[in-house]
Amino acid sequence: MLYRRNPQLNKNGELIHLLSTEGLSKAILTQILDTAANFVSVSSREVKKVPLLRGKSVFNLFFENSTRTRTTFEIAATRLSADVINLDIARSSASKGESLLDTIANLSAMAADLFVVRHGESGAPYLIAQHVAPHVHVVNAGDGRHAHPTQGLLDMYTIRHYKKDFSNLTVAIVGDVLHSRVARSDIHALTTLGCAEVRVVGPKTLVPADMAQMGVRVCNTLEEGIRGADVIIMLRLQNERMTGALLPSSQEFSKSFGLTTDKLQLARPDAIVMHPGPINRGVEIDSAVVDGVQSVILPQVTFGIAVRMAVMSIVAGNEA
């Protein structure tokens, strides 16, 4: 998706919406990660709040189901002292045929300050960002196959937390890359942050043809893909988005690309294992790996709150 200018930034180059990790500079990505680092300690305080968004209204608009993302956004906004409104899409006027922009216009009339949007159509958050008032901000919580920038950012935070520096890292992204908005967000962020090597690993039917053009190495066997890797990011099979016979079966996929403790030994001894969730144990990853010492899957969730606090506080502090 190409744009004449980056709609995420104002004329001063400041972040006013978070729509994608693509097109964001290393300086902006680092600003978000550094700000998140300052928020991590909030979760361990007796009073888990800071007043940065006091008096602001944050509307969570999830047109697709979500547990972790919606909950962590709600927690993040609450810890910033915002008023949080969760729209019940199934019972809203949108379910009765109201257009997306009419829904946004009506909610804007209720003095919304920030929209967190998850939508099945790629580009929906961009459309909203182009039609809101200058003081209103949009954060993409996942749009179609296109992008999931806050997941990408929390993945970057997790990697930086455990590995410190990106410049010598080999990161392998394994699984259903074709349907994964997380993979795209991770790739854009990793390359911008100077990761030494990014590998995309999966069967040919689940790896987009344009991956090599994104500056990554494509591997069609798990063994090649994770050998010597510092970071392994596992992705589930998104059966709900698949059309046609892309795989013989999930069992065959698991046999070839499922991460087991034995296969994990091909990676570096201090490699970390990540997963954006939801996890399908026994398919893309064995329980022994999920619950093992190299797994940082639960810390990812914890860091996600701080990262989303950082994103909302930064965009809300800048004017279009």
Swiss-Prot record:
PANTHER family: ASPARTATE CARBAMOYLTRANSFERASE, ORNITHINE CARBAMOYLTRANSFERASE, MITOCHONDRIAL. This is Aspartate carbamoyltransferase catalytic subunit. Carbamoyl phosphate binds at residues 68-69, 118, 148, 151, 277-278. Its EC number is 2.1.3.2. Keywords: Pyrimidine biosynthesis, Transferase. HAMAP family: Asp_carb_tr (MF_00001). It comes from the Bacteria. One of its GO terms (cellular component) is cytosol. It catalyses: carbamoyl phosphate + L-aspartate = N-carbamoyl-L-aspartate + phosphate + H(+). L-aspartate binds at residues 96, 181, 236. GO terms for biological process: 'de novo' pyrimidine nucleobase biosynthetic process; 'de novo' UMP biosynthetic process; amino acid metabolic process. Pfam families: OTCace, OTCace_N. One of its GO terms (molecular function) is aspartate carbamoyltransferase activity.
